[in-house]
Amino acid sequence: MAFFHSRYDHYTPCSGEHNGIAQKIQIVISAREKVVSPIRQWYNEAVTQWYCRPERYGVMNGGAHVAGTFKEKTMEKNGYTDTIRKGLLGVRALGSSMSRGKGSAEEQMKRLRAALEGADAVVIGAGAGLSTSAGLTYSGERFERIFFDFAAKYGIRDMYSGGFYPFPDDETRWAWWARHIYFNRYIDPPRPVYRQLLELVKGRNCFVITTNVDHQFQRAGFDKAQLFYTQGDYGLFQSVNPAIQETFDNEAWTMQAMAAQGFVRDETGLFRVPEDGRLSMQIPTDLVPSCPTDGSGVVMNLRADDSFVEDAGWRRASAAYADFLRAHEAGRVLYLELGVGANTPVIIKYPFWQMTSENPEAIYACINYSEAFCPQAIEGQSLCFNRDIGDVINEICI
C-alpha cells in the first residue's frame, strides 16, 4: 500500500468482536495523523531531498544495482523529480500566509471560465478528492457492501486500513486485494465526473499529472500520451525481486480471483455480490500471483518506498510531462488542481504554486471540498473553490 496516497486522508475507527489487530493498525494511523501538521514542512523537504538524491536512480534495496546506469538514468528527462524540485522551491519562496482567493464565488467562476477559454495550455493536477467526487469512496456503504465479511471477521472498517492488515496467509491477502483492485480499477465510478472533465478540456492543449492509481482518467477516455500517473497503478504487479524492473498487467488474474471468491456477473458483465451473500475470503493457492519472469512473489505497483518500479511506460510519461511543462513555461497557462490533499502536496500543489508565481500570465485554480486555498503571494492569479469537484465542473459547463 502506498503511504504517499492523498486518497487516504480520512479514516473510520475499527470496531467489532475480532478487531484487536485492526484497532492497533488504526491507532498507528491515527497517531500518525496527529503529528502530520507540525512536521509537514519538514516532511515535504525530507521527501523531496530523498527523491532527488542521485543514488535513487542507480541503487535500490540495500545496494542491489538495477537496470540502467546512473549516467543513463540522470540523462533521462524526469518530470517527477523536476516537479518535486519546483515544489520545494515553492514552499521556500512563497511563504506560509494563505488566502481563499479574491472576489465572490460568482466572480471567481467567471474568471475560471475565461481562463479556460483563453488558455494556451491546461495542466490538470488530480488527487484523491477527484475520485471521491466520482463516488469511489473507501469507507461507508460502499466498503460494507464489498468487504462485509472481512469487516465482520477482522474488524476492518475501510479499504485503506485493510491494505495494512496482516492477513494469516497469502490466499486471504490476495482475495482482499482482488476485490480492492477490481472495484477501484476495473469498473466505472458511480458518478461521471471524469467524463465531464474530459468534455470540459476536449480539444484543448492539456496534460494530466495525478497521484491517483485507479486508472480512471484512461477509463474516461483521456489520451494516455497526455497522462502521468506518478504513484503507480492498481492494474499492475511488480516482482519482489529488485533486479526485475518490469511491471505486469493483472486484469486476467483479477477476474479469475473474483470468480474464485464467488462473485457473480450481472446482466452488464460486472461482478456483484451473490444474492445469498456467500463469498469465500480466500483464493485457491494456485491463484496466488507470482512473477512471470522468475516465479518470485509479487506486490502491487504502488509507490511506498524506493522499491517502487518506474518501468518504461512510467519513464515515458515522466519525460512527456517534463517536455510539456518546459514548452509552456510562459504564456496563458491554467494550472487546474482537483482534489489534491495534504499527503503529497510536493508533487502537484506546491509545484503549481511555484509555476504560477514564475509566470505572470498563469492562473492557478484549486477545486477541493474544504481544502481550497493559495499563497497570498499569488492571490491575484488564483481561484479557489471550496466545493465538490463534480458540482463545479457542471457549473463551468452551464
For each feature predicted by the language model, list its residue ranges.
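Ala/Thr-enriched low-complexity intrinsically disordered regions
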Residues: A2, T12-P13, A22, A31, ...
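N-terminal targeting/docking segments
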Residues: P38-N44, Q49
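Short terminal hydrophobic/aromatic SLiMs and anchors at protein ends
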Residues: H10-Y11, H18-I21, E33, Y43, ...
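Polybasic, low-complexity intrinsically disordered segments
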Residues: H5-R7
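Conserved catalytic alpha/beta core of Sir2/sirtuin-type deacylases, generalized to analogous enzyme cores
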Residues: W50-I398
